Regions:
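Active-site helix of classical SDR
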Residues: 121, 156, 164
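Residue(s) in the substrate-gating loop at a strand-loop-helix junction
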Residues: 141
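A glycine/serine/threonine-rich, flexible loop-to-helix segment
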Residues: 173, 185-209
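Short C-terminal tail/terminal secondary-structure segment
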Residues: 224-225, 236-249
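Alpha-helical segment proximal to the catalytic Tyr-Lys
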Residues: 126, 169-173, 233
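Substrate-binding pocket helix/loop in short-chain dehydrogenase/reductase
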Residues: 97-98, 102-107, 201, 205
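Canonical Rossmann dinucleotide-binding motif of NAD(H)/NADP(H)-dependent dehydrogenases/reductases
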Residues: 3-33
Length: 249
């Protein structure tokens, strides 16, 4: 198993990509803590994993709250003894140009998407140090590479990209790796209402990708699994783009 004897904490793990990542991690031998503000969905995912023989704990986690992050890390250590893997998966999207973006919207998106990654990383590093190393996987976006029309979202995901590189350099000597994942358009409960809720929208977004379809959560989860595992032991500060060829055009 690719994650045997590993302990992982996944933010935004109640549904969508985070839930798929959690289930895949457990299938590969990991023990998992999922954190989210969506308590009902989180408890459902926890039950689904445990009913199949996996080991999963759900904790309420507001990623903008430093104390909540400390509590989530403590939950992983208290239940499973250590922390090896952090997946900063939680995020939101707002699609507005600069003039239509309010200060409140900017602050909300930056707090969840960028500050949340910072706080998660900060909370996880001391326990990874005790464990002798670890892997941090930050979910950015192709919007963090190319910009586009999503002002606050692109800025937040660009921040994730460079925070990843900064963290990678700072902690490489302690065996703590940090890499970012940059998805294209992925069919999730977050993106579907905004982009994929009509056949026209689905066709348009599928056509943007040279492979001719939008991505599925599993497409991203397999990449996250690789970065979380020891198979990627010589990768840190890197960008894993999983976008159906969109940014190659």
């Amino acid at each position: 198993m690719r994650l045997e004897n590993k302990v992982a904490l996944i933010s935004g793990g109640a549904r969508g990509m985070g839930a798929v990542e959690a289930k895949m991690f457990v299938q590969e031998g990991a023990k998992v803590v999922i954190g989210d503000v969506l308590d009902e969905d989180g408890k459902q995912t926890e039950s689904e994993i445990n009913e199949t023989g996996g080991e999963c704990v759900f904790v309420h986690l507001d990623v903008t709250d430093e104390t909540a992050w400390q509590d989530a890390v403590a939950a992983a250590v208290d239940r499973f003894g250590k922390l090896d893997i952090l997946v900063n998966n939680a995020g939101i999207a707002r699609i507005n140009n600069v003039e239509d973006t309010t200060s409140d919207e900017w602050d909300l998106v930056m707090d969840i998407n960028a500050k949340g990654v910072f706080l998660g990383t900060k909370a996880a590093i001391p326990e990874m140090r005790k464990a002798g190393g670890g892997s941090i996987v930050n979910i950015s976006s192709i919007a963090g590479l190319t910009g586009g029309r999503t002002s606050s979202y692109a800025a937040s995901k660009g921040a994730v990209r460079l925070l990843t590189k900064s963290s990678a350099i700072q902690y490489a000597g302690e065996g703590i790796r940090c890499n970012s994942v940059h998805p294209g358009v992925i069919e999730t409960p977050m993106t579907t209402p905004m982009m994929l809720n009509t056949q026209e929208g689905r066709d348009l977004n599928a056509s943007r990708h040279p492979l001719g379809r939008v991505g599925q959560p599993e497409d991203i989860a397999y990449g996250v699994l690789f970065l979380a595992s020891d198979e990627s032991s010589f990768m840190t500060g890197s960008e894993l783009v999983i976008d159906g060829g969109l940014t190659a055009q």
